[in-house]
């Protein structure tokens, strides 16, 4: 977790980092919690302002509810949400938006389920370094999100039925100042439904060096680094979906600077996650396939994540992440810290839920290939 804690939290406690050698007083074995801190810990929640115990906030159809609003400088350190709603697909229908420093365009604009990891509209218990879904449908995010002037969080009900109960607890710190190189958290959502296959002539070698027809995970411009990706896959064809190699293009390079060996390898698994008959879900600090159902079959589902906490992918001008041909219907998110900037709207609600409601075998003329990611950028 040093990629986030080192970039943001340490600077708040001690001031900006310098290149000078540490003094003898700074060379100590003490953890941060044993040292004096210079921030104020606070929380905004949905608690009952009357003093009663009715802490829920209903969100009517088509309405937006503000759940957080504070002046900076500061850092959001933890977001907890839980929802009771009659619609089975409310995780796809409720959109989370986060705004920094008064910018009218959100830096995060993602369906709630896709942001927290249950990206196929299904709650499942898992844990990782930055996101988790606890038992009884509690959603948690532990990415540090700094802001200089202000931070604002809203949720919008884009479904067709009222959300009866929306609860929130958002922990944050107010700090005297932030380091000059502080970056802002962004999350970019994309989906492809269905994701068409790439066809090769009969007998031709399946060569792909430049990613011209690859599936796009994420594209952005500016300066920052990629912290991680979440991916949701809904298969619309038989057999293994995950042989696509990831390709990472940095700062407008025409050729990838990083090329991987397959989708399950990028998510730090192997061998088709165990295959059609032996797949077992797993969830670790920095990688996981926390939901696997009916693998390698039409209607099969996968929820995956990968955090680059130990080695974020840095860029100065632009970043593109592609995958070799992808079979299934897809949705994905990328998390990146960077200056305030690029916005990408999620697709309309009917398209977000389409893959969950209607899985069909593709035309026999289409040879499906694999992959569907969800990305969360933190810039």
Positions of predicted regions on the chain:
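Beta-strand-centric surfaces of beta-sandwich/beta-rich domains
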Residues: 17-376
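N-terminal export signals
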Residues: 1-14
């Amino acid at each position: 977790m040093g990629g986030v804690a080192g970039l943001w939290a340490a600077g708040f406690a001690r001031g900006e980092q310098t290149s000078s050698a540490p003094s003898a007083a700074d060379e100590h074995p003490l953890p941060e919690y044993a040292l004096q801190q210079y921030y104020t810990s606070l929380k905004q929640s949905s608690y009952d302002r009357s003093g009663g115990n009715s802490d829920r906030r209903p969100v009517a159809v088509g309405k937006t509810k503000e759940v957080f609003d504070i002046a900076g400088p500061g850092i959001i350190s933890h977001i907890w949400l839980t929802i009771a709603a009659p619609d089975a697909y409310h995780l796809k229908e409720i959109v989370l938006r986060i705004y920094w420093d008064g910018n009218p365009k959100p830096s995060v604009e993602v369906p709630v389920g896709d942001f927290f990891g249950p990206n196929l509209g299904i709650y499942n218990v898992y844990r990782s370094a930055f996101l988790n879904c606890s038992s009884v449908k509690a959603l948690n995010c532990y990415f540090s999100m700094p802001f200089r002037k202000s931070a604002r969080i809203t949720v919008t009900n884009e479904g067709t039925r009222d959300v009866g109960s929306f609860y929130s607890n958002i922990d944050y710190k107010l700090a005297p100042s932030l380091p000059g190189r502080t970056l802002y958290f962004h999350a970019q959502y994309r989906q492809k439904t269905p994701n068409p296959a790439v066809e090769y002539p009969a007998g031709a070698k399946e060569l792909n060096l430049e990613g011209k027809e690859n599936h796009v995970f994420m594209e952005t411009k500016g300066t920052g680094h990629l912290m991680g990706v979440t991916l949701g896959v809904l298969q619309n064809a038989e057999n293994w979906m995950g042989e696509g190699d990831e390709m990472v293009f940095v700062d407008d390079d025409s050729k990838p600077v990083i090329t991987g060996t397959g989708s399950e390898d990028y998510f730090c698994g192997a061998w088709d996650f165990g295959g059609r008959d032996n797949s077992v879900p797993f969830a670790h600090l920095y990688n996981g396939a926390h939901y696997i159902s009916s693998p390698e079959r039409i209607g099969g589902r996968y929820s995956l994540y990968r955090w680059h906490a130990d080695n974020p992918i840095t860029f100065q001008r632009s970043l593109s992440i592609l995958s070799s041909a992808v079979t299934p219907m897809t949705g994905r998110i990328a998390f990146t810290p960077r200056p305030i900037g690029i916005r990408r709207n999620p697709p309309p609600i009917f398209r977000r839920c389409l893959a969950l409601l209607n899985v069909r075998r593709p035309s026999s003329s289409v040879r499906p290939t694999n992959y569907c990611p969800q990305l969360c950028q933190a810039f």
